[in-house]
Amino acid sequence: MMNIALYLDAGIHQGGWRHPEAVSSGGTNWPLFRRIAQQAEAAKLDMIFVADKLAIDDIYGGDLSATVRSRPQGWSEPLTLLAALAAVTDRIGLGGTVSSSYSLPYTTARQLANIDHLSGGRAAWNLVTSVSDAEARNFGRDSHYSHAERYAR
């Protein structure tokens, strides 16, 4: 059996502004996310997937101010967005990323269980351990956990 998921990542591509129908707030635009989710469900896709990273990509050589100036768009936190999408869809699965390195097990389980209950059993979890020192700094650490530490958590 084949399952088809939509990677819901609207409006964050750096060159996306050049498209004539582009919106500048794509990463946090609720009407856009709602419309895409409903269209995916109408097309009989199996799941919507929302990825996450807990830091702004550092693509400007370690200069955070240049990164912030050059990448003004934000993006939605997956579990909050999926809870909202549960209310405007009926069948499509709702999958989101949560980092085991920087999220507490009880809180994560509670949030995912809540989405699962609200959606009638449609929640899915993309478990990641995160990848960067930038993410670690957002949680009071100087550097990211070692590979062994990440997988021991």
Question: For each of these PLM feature ranges, what is it?
Answer:
Residues 1-88:
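N-terminal beta1-alpha1-beta2 module of alpha/beta enzyme domains
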Residues 7-26, 100-153:
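Flexible, glycine-rich active-site loops centered on histidine and acidic residues
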